[in-house]
From Swiss-Prot:
Name recorded for this polypeptide: Iron-sulfur cluster carrier protein
Annotated residues for binding of ATP: G115, K116, G117, G118, V119, G120, K121, S122
Pfam family, one: ParA
UniProt keyword terms in alphabetical order: ATP-binding, Hydrolase, Iron, Iron-sulfur, Metal-binding, Nucleotide-binding
GO biological process: iron-sulfur cluster assembly
GO cellular component: cytosol
InterPro entries: FSCA_dom_sf (IPR034904), Mrp-like_CS (IPR000808), Mrp/NBP35_ATP-bd (IPR019591), NUBPL-like (IPR044304), P-loop_NTPase (IPR027417), YlxH/NBP35 (IPR033756)
Length: 369
């Protein structure tokens, strides 16, 4: 230990670290890390400063930014030769809509919705789920689009069929680390679903409740597009923690996105924010960026309804190709700029879920990443 650090008590060392962390600002932080009581442990050993944070929501991408911004200052003020950073998560179970009881094994349900089809809702839901997992969470996804299930194909699992270990419940299909279920696993592409609304809603509720979900921090619910009776019934009856609305910058999509926000407000489901998909087209030949569907629409919509613009996802041919192959971009191109955007989105969704929610005491699990 050098002379500079010998002069510091453990309390003084912790105070220096806490003071530095308090100055770190990030879109995922409503309050600073010190106020959040995220600083779990500070220690000194062999000229190395050990810093451990515990966060109540997934935060890996933001954690990398923290290390980049704060390491030099901590080395300077402590005299350490190196810093050993560690991040752990205490993912809390948050209050569900209308205090409904939860689904066994599932802490939080995030509904991904769109007011109309064709805006990339399912592709966003899949990559969001995979990004949450990449950030350190245990994640599942339920394909709630009874009439047009696409999740099995996007995950390369369309030929798999769920099993029933007890003759009553279904075991989820595991794909790319996600626990999944979909009506698409039970019917073939040639068999169109002709169920009426109540039957479709009942089928989905059965899938949700009778799937043997493993312990999940987040279950992403890929809602059917639209704002009709089925969507309203699902929003009312599923113990959702929060909802994400997907749109494009196009005016017609924004009109329908407004309806989706209003629907969730009516049934008291917190809207976490808006994801603007296809915000800009990136040419695969020259890399030129062009906002073919317009600009600024989602941002104005978020401002009008006092919610967040959680992310803006580009339109690029590789995103579509990856889904067609059953290996979404977050899995197939982990170092790509698109995966970085999805992981930032995951951090913001998880953070917004926490800040808008209310922790249910006693339902927290610990896991280091």
């Amino acid at each position: 230990m050098n002379e500079q650090s010998q002069a510091k008590s453990p309390e003084a060392l912790r105070a220096m670290v806490a003071g530095t962390l308090a100055n770190f600002q990030h879109p995922t932080l409503k309050h600073n890390l010190t106020t959040l009581k995220a600083l779990h442990h500070v220690a000194w050993m062999d000229d190395t400063l050990h810093v451990e944070l515990v966060m109540p929501f997934v935060w890996h991408s933001a954690f990398e930014e923290l290390k980049e911004q704060c390491s030099a200052e901590l080395l300077r003020i402590t005299g350490a030769k190196a810093i050993d950073w560690k991040l752990s998560h205490n993912i809390a179970t948050l209050k569900r809509v209308k205090n409904q009881p939860g689904i066994n094994g599932v802490k939080n349900i995030i509904a991904v919705s769109s007011g109309k089809g064709g805006v990339g809702k399912s592709s966003t839901a899949v990559n969001l789920a995979l990004a949450l997992a990449a950030e350190g969470a245990k994640v599942g996804i339920l394909d709630a689009d009874i009439y047009g299930p696409s999740i099995p194909t996007m995950l390369g699992a369309e030929n798999q069929r769920p099993t029933s270990p007890d003759g009553t419940h279904m075991a989820p299909i595991m794909s790319h680390g996600l626990a999944t279920n979909s009506i698409g696993y039970l019917v073939t592409d040639d068999n169109a679903m002709v169920w009426r609304g109540p039957m479709a809603s009942k089928a989905l509720m059965q899938m949700l409740q009778e799937t043997l979900w493993p312990d999940l921090d987040y279950l992403v619910l890929d809602m059917p597009p639209g704002t009709g009776d089925i969507q309203l019934t699902l929003a009312q009856n599923i113990p959702v923690t929060g909802a994400v609305v997907v749109t494009t910058p196009q005016d017609i999509a924004l009109i329908d996105a407004k309806k989706g926000i209003v629907m969730f407000e009516k049934v008291e489901v917190p809207v976490l924010g808006i994801v603007e998909n296809m915000s800009v087209h990136i040419c695969s030949n020259c890399g030129h960026h062009e906002p073919i569907f317009g600009t600024g629409g989602a941002e104005k919509l978020a401002e009008k309804y006092h919610t967040q613009l959680l992310g803006q996802m580009p339109l690029h041919i590789s995103l579509r190709e990856d889904l067609d192959k059953g290996t979404p971009t977050v899995i197939s191109r982990p170092e790509s700029e698109f995966t970085a955007i999805y992981r930032q989105l995951a951090d913001r969704v998880a953070a917004q879920l926490y800040w808008q929610g209310e922790v249910i005491p006693g339902e927290i699990s610990f896991r280091a990443v």
